């Protein structure tokens, strides 16, 4: 009986283990694991397997006939119980260094049971469950199953930062670095907020790929090691390479040889300098021996599905030559910092290396050395750098020493000294003392060089002992150095005295030569070291006169002396070099010309940069001037329009007053005057223009839709916008004028009432300049629509503010002009005893440069007490600009809300619009939740924040308009006379 079928019959009817939410979960797993209850698990016999066999959880054991599994009683838990249990077990699993195979099997079954019982939905809890399952599968080596779980998370739209990182880590374990990198790049596209962390993982992938290309494996990644299920005493290790295990078995002879002898490695191996390699070497004792003693090391390496690259577990190298055999060996405990250092047969410390050399009976002794570098010891690297610098100084000192000997004509001593130095260099090969002791076992006699006096008095071992300095003799060495410094100072004083004597003798000799020969060729003297080299008699004379000085200063050290004399010579030469003044050669003409050319080029570059900067500044200034001119032109135009509007209003008032005085008597009709020829010509021109317009309009009908309003055609040009149940189009009339056509569908009774109310208000305000003009309208109740032909506005105030908004805020001059026009428009409707009730930036449109008020759907007439009652089933107006009193219900429990509003309610809305013009956002924009925003508006204790603004008068106007008490708010005339509008 199939395990999944038996489990599906007994599980809860709401869940389906094979098909979760229409998705087959089994296709995301490489194989399905049987579900076994804990009781049946104890009853099943556990097969005994040898400890040398290494098993992995991910290997599928193919059998000819699958064994039938006993039917399991499903365990039903609440989802929270499953999540808590999985979380607890994963914490326990992460804390264990070597989880047992039984515990791994238990966790596998636990995850399977939870997966079958939980509902597969995109929830945070189920996301954590699947992420824990993928992490667990990756840690136990089930990389394919982990990838299947992560792919299933992608199907459930659970793409997160952790999913991409875990997928890329699995691919990098399998050395598919390009795929891992593509996964991280996909994660950067999906989750750009975590791009910095993704870039860090890209760097890790590059490092791993570099290690893999150099070493054949990832040394720094220690997560690729898992332990065998067998006996712990065997200490068998499996290293996952290309998602495949590798088993290394050694026979007993090889294991015994490894325990007795240190492991042999190549001195050029890069593993010696890395801390990670030391951990691999320390685990080499855990390689499992096999009972077969006749097999070799190469035969004992059994790879299971390995690719071209194999992990470097043991590096064995032995070089043989015709003359000598050299093997570098490392003790097992040489990489442990706390372990004691092994002792050689003489009782000396060996730090990390021993050198065993077997020399044949040849004519010359060939010494080989090895240099070890430890990255963990920074002091060793500094010592080596200092030694390299000392070697360079030695070479320079030897050259200077040879020059001094040549100047003093001590060629014989100089040749002996060079021979001694060459012999010493050939023998010791610059052995370094770097906190390590080198022991050279010389088993054969060395041949001597008859030309060198050192070969008869000292051997190779004496030279090494004279050069190498151990850790125990460092204090003695420092004391000797101090004594040498004192001796050097004394020698320097003696040398200075000798030089003074030589200079005096030279001056005397030069005076004698000048007396004998008044004309001397300039080439007979050389200025090297201030000593004449014209004849050999002078140097001979000085040598005869000062035999002690020449012997004490020029005599080279014999080869039988120790290295202390070499150190003395080195310090004396360094002291002489320090006392010499630096020789600065005069600059050549070519060098001077080059310097002049460079200076000229630099000056030219600086001049070009200055010119470019000046041009940029000029361009910026010109752009600013153009902007200022445009602003001034706009201001002048708006001021002219305002003056014209004021004049028209004054004329209307005067006409009304005259009508009142004349008791509403109409003026007498004008008598028709005879038409002149010019008037007739104008009429003819107008008639011809009308004919042309009609023709063009008829042509335009062929390519555009036509809307009929009261029998008049209007061509639809483009769609402007929509709001509620209405749509607005840009149309062209028969006389070729642009208008706005508003189409409203009468599906809601409230909408019908609002549109009819707007028509009445616009008809009432038809003669007002600051109000949008109603051109024509049609109400068709049979077809449930209303058509309104309105004056066309180019742009509303909301979009205009977005264009004018800058990082420094909107220009105060623009705010002042638009604020004045808004006040005049609202003052017009207040004079007609109308309250708008829904003032916002979108309800002010710009018509040929001037702002006009639109949307009178909820406007109401004011009653006798300067207020009006607005009854609605829901709130009215836009909440960002609505006044507190418009949100307070005064119906006292009635079926509909009743708000009592006045002119002060529109003042509050104007203040909110001015706040947005000044700071870029309305006063209650910070509250994202509509309920919290509602409570903040009606709360009298909530203080509105007023940011800092350079114009103090603007802040004063804002604070006056946003007073919570409507009786304390200013009126429109007060705001028009405020200092803010005075330029």
Swiss-Prot record:
Feature: compositional bias, Polar residues: 1-18, 279-301
Active-site residues from the entry: 838
Coiled coil: 380-430, 474-517, 588-665
InterPro entries named among the record's database cross-references: Kinase-like_dom_sf (IPR011009), Mps1_cat (IPR027084), Prot_kinase_dom (IPR000719), Protein_kinase_ATP_BS (IPR017441)
GO biological process, one term: protein localization to kinetochore
GO molecular function terms noted in the UniProt entry: ATP binding; protein serine kinase activity; protein serine/threonine kinase activity; protein serine/threonine/tyrosine kinase activity
Keyword tags: ATP-binding, Coiled coil, Kinase, Nucleotide-binding, Serine/threonine-protein kinase, Transferase
Feature: compositional bias, Acidic residues: 374-403
Boundaries of every Protein kinase domain copy: 714-981
Identification of the protein by name: Probable serine/threonine-protein kinase mps1
Species of origin: Dictyostelium discoideum
UniProt gene name: mps1
């Amino acid at each position: 009986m199939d395990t999944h079928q038996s489990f599906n019959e007994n599980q809860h009817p709401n869940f389906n283990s094979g098909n979760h939410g229409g998705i087959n979960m089994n296709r995301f797993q490489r194989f399905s694991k049987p579900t076994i209850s804990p009781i049946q698990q104890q009853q099943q016999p556990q097969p005994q397997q040898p400890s040398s066999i290494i098993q992995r959880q991910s290997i599928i054991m193919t059998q000819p006939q699958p064994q039938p599994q006993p039917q399991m009683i499903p365990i039903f838990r609440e989802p929270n119980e499953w999540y808590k249990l999985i979380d607890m077990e994963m914490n326990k699993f992460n804390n264990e260094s070597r989880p047992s195979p039984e515990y791994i099997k238990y966790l596998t079954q636990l995850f399977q049971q939870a997966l079958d019982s939980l509902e597969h939905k995109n929830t945070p809890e189920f996301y954590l469950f699947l992420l824990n399952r993928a992490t667990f599968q990756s840690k136990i080596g089930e990389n394919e199953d982990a990838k299947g779980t992560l792919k299933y998370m992608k199907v459930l739209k659970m793409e997160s930062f952790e999913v991409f990182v875990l997928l890329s880590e699995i691919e990098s374990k399998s050395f598919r670095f390009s795929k891992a990198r593509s996964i991280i790049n996909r994660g950067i596209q999906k989750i750009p907020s975590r791009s910095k962390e993704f870039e860090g993982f890209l760097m890790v992938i590059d490092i791993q790929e570099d290690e893999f290309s150099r070493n054949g494996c990832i040394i720094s990644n220690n997560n690729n090691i898992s332990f065998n299920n067998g006996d712990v005493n065997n200490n068998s290790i499996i290293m996952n390479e290309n998602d495949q295990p590798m088993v290394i078995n050694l026979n007993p002879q090889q294991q015994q040889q490894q325990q007795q002898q240190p492991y042999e490695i190549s001195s050029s191996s890069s593993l010696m300098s890395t801390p990670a390699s030391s951990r691999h070497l320390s685990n080499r004792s855990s390689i499992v021996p096999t009972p077969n003693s006749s097999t070799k090391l190469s035969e004992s390496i059994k790879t299971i599905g390995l690719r071209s690259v194999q992990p470097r577990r043991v590096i064995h190298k032995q070089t043989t030559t015709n003359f000598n055999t050299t093997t570098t060996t490392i003790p097992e405990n040489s990489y442990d910092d706390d372990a004691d250092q092994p002792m050689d047969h003489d009782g000396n410390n060996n730090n990390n290396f021993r050198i065993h050399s077997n020399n044949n009976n040849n004519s010359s002794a060939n010494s080989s050395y090895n240099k070890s570098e430890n990255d963990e010891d920074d002091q060793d690297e500094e010592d080596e750098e200092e030694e390299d610098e000392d070697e360079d100084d030695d070479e320079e000192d030897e050259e200077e020493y040879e020059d001094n000997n040549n100047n003093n004509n001590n060629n014989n001593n100089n040749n002996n000294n060079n021979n001694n130095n060459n012999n010493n260099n050939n023998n010791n090969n610059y052995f370094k003392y770097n906190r390590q002791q080198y022991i050279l076992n010389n088993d054969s006699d060395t041949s001597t060089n008859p030309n060198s006096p050192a070969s008869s008095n000292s051997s190779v071992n004496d030279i090494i002992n004279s050069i190498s300095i151990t850790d125990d003799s460092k204090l003695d060495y420092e004391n000797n150095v101090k004594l040498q410094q004192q001796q050097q100072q004394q020698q320097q004083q003696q040398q200075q005295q000798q030089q003074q004597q030589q200079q005096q003798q030279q001056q005397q000799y030069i005076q004698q030569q000048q007396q004998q020969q008044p004309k001397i060729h300039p080439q007979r003297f050389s200025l090297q070291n201030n000593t004449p080299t014209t004849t050999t008699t002078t140097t001979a004379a000085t040598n005869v006169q000062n035999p002690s000085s020449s012997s004490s200063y020029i005599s080279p050290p014999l080869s039988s002396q120790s290295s202390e004399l070499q150190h003395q010579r080195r310090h004396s030469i360094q002291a002489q070099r320090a006392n010499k003044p630096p020789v600065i050669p005069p600059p050549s003409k070519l060098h001077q010309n080059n310097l002049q050319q460079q200076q000229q080029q630099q000056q030219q570059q600086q001049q070009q940069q200055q010119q470019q900067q000046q041009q940029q500044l000029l361009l910026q200034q010109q752009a600013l001037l153009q902007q200022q001119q445009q602003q001034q032109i706009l201001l002048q135009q708006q001021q002219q329009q305002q003056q014209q509007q004021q004049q028209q209003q004054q004329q209307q008032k005067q006409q009304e007053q005259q009508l009142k005085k004349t008791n509403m008597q109409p003026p007498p009709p004008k008598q028709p005057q005879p038409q002149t020829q010019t008037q007739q010509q104008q009429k003819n021109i107008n008639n011809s223009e009308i004919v042309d317009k009609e023709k063009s309009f008829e042509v335009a009908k062929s390519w555009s839709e036509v809307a009929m309003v009261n029998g008049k055609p209007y061509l639809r040009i483009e769609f402007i916008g929509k709001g509620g149940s209405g749509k607005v189009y840009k149309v062209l009339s028969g006389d070729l004028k642009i208008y706005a056509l508003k189409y409203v569908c009468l599906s809601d009774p409230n909408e019908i009432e609002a549109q009819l109310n707007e028509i009445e208000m616009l008809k009432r305000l038809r003669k007002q300049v600051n109000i949008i003009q109603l051109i024509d309208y049609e109400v068709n109740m049979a077809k449930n629509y209303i058509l309104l032909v309105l004056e066309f506005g180019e742009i509303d105030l909301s979009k205009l503010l977005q264009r004018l908004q800058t990082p420094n805020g909107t220009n105060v001059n623009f705010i002042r002009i638009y604020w004045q026009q808004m006040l005049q428009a609202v003052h017009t409707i207040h004079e007609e005893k109308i309250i708008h009730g829904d003032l916002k930036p979108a309800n002010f449109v710009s018509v040929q440069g001037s702002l006009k008020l639109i949307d009178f759907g909820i406007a109401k007439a004011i009653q006798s007490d300067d207020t009006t009652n607005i009854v609605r089933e829901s709130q009215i107006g836009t909440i960002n600009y609505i006044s507190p009193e418009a949100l307070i219900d005064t119906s006292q429990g009635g079926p509909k809300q009743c708000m009592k509003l006045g002119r002060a309610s529109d003042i509050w809305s104007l203040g909110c619009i001015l706040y947005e013009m000044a700071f870029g956002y309305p006063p209650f924009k910070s509250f994202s939740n509509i309920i919290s925003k509602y409570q903040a508006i009606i709360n009298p204790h909530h203080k509105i924040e007023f940011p800092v603004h350079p114009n103090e008068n603007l802040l004063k106007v804002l604070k006056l308009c946003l007073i919570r008490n409507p009786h304390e708010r200013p009126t429109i005339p007060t705001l028009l006379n405020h200092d803010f509008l005075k330029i």
